[in-house]
């Protein structure tokens, strides 16, 4: 079988599962199709509407016409948690006339990367994804509970960067790393965050589209691995009232495409003028992009909590209270860490 996946605007995997022969046939006759409305579908299954409870006709045809899923074969991978051989491939969404679907997240990102390419810039990103492991919770009316690890005990205190606290779930993370290796998801460091059974996994830095695809696949991978170990994994921004929220910190830098030099760095002032302008752009447009940074009602519980989620667009060197932190002032590591986005 082949899973044809497309990330919707909430990062949920939509698509179709096809027999291999039907998948191959669909490559020639464009029969891999879904309704256009998937890109205005919310995480709860409803549809995004405007203030008058109308669908946004500028990005949606009221007849809910088909769109075509075009596989991006650079993303084809084995699905490692199935017993039967199964492949997965991320698809680009195109209209029936062959034009890109404008509200597909991959279309938007490709357009942005083309703008950088025209300026001879090469953007580099590295995500840090936080999440919670929790006991299975089939009834959402009940609050989430901290799971029990290998020791048979439930974590009660805050174990920020605790090694043994991570090792409580070592069998799970062994599977996560193995699954990721099979899928070419380049995860790096894991550490315990300040919440009970709250973890963070870092990704290797690289191309923004490739990293976006990897994070999309990683979330699905972690959830499946957790289920195997009779746990749930959640990327909710604020899943438990008395625990810290979960963030998706995005480290970002710019290289000169020709000589691969970090153009955020200046020998004279350490921070280049272009980097200051870049930060200014983030400060200007982040408030307008909060539906992206905080897409759900729950997202704002994280931002208004008393924990270390930033509630500003200030920047500072090594300052975690700022929305935009500069972790290093050396040439190789000169970058901006956007700390505003939730993990959802």
Description of each model-found segment:
Residues 1-189, 211, 231:
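ATP/Mg2+-dependent ligation/transfer catalytic cores
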Residues 7-10, 26, 39, 210, ...:
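C-terminal accessory/tail domains of diverse enzymes
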Residues 78-85, 123, 190-194, 243, ...:
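Short glycine/proline-enriched loop/turn "hinge" motifs that connect secondary-structure elements
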Residues 89-95, 199-205, 252, 338:
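Short, hydrophobic beta-strand segments
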Residues 129, 193-201:
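Short, conserved phosphate-binding/catalytic loop or strand-edge motifs used
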Residues 142-151, 248-256, 313-315, 320-328:
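Short beta-strand elements
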Residues 151-172, 178, 260-297:
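C-terminal helix-cap and adjacent tail motif
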Residues 198, 203, 210-280:
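Acidic, glycine-rich loop-and-beta core segments that form the ion-binding/anion-interacting portion
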């Amino acid at each position: 079988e082949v899973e044809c996946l497309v990330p919707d605007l909430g990062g949920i995997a939509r698509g179709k599962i096809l027999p291999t022969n039907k998948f191959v046939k669909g490559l020639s006759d464009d029969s891999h199709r879904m309704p256009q409305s998937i890109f205005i579908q919310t995480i709860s299954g409803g549809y995004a509407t405007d203030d008058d409870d109308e669908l946004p006709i500028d990005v949606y045809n009221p007849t809910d016409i088909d769109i075509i899923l075009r596989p991006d074969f650079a993303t084809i991978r084995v699905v490692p948690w199935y017993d039967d051989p199964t492949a997965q491939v991320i698809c680009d969404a195109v209209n029936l006339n062959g034009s890109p679907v404008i509200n597909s997240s991959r279309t938007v990102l490709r357009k942005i990367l083309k703008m950088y390419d025209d300026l001879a810039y090469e953007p580099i990103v590295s995500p840090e994804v936080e999440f919670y492991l929790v006991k299975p919770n089939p009834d959402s009316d009940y609050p989430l509970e901290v799971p029990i690890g290998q020791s048979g005990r439930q974590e009660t205190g805050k174990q920020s960067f605790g090694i043994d606290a991570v090792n409580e779930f070592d069998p799970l993370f062994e599977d996560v790393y193995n699954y990721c290796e099979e899928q070419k998801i380049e995860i790096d460091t894991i550490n315990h965050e300040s919440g009970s059974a709250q973890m963070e996994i870092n990704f290797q830095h690289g191309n923004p589209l490739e990293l976006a695809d990897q994070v999309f696949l990683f979330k699905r991978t972690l959830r499946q691995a957790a289920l195997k170990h009779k746990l749930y994994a959640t990327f909710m921004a604020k899943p438990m009232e008395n625990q810290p929220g979960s963030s998706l910190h995005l480290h970002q830098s710019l290289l000169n495409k020709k000589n691969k030099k970090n153009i955020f760095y200046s020998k004279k002032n350490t921070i280049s003028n272009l980097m200051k302008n870049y930060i200014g752009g983030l400060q200007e447009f982040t408030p307008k992009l909060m539906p992206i940074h905080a897409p759900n009602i729950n997202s704002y519980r994280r931002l208004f909590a008393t924990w270390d989620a930033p509630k500003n667009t200030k920047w500072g060197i090594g300052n975690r209270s700022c929305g935009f932190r500069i972790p290093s002032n050396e040439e190789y590591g000169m970058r901006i860490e956007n700390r505003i986005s939730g993990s959802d």
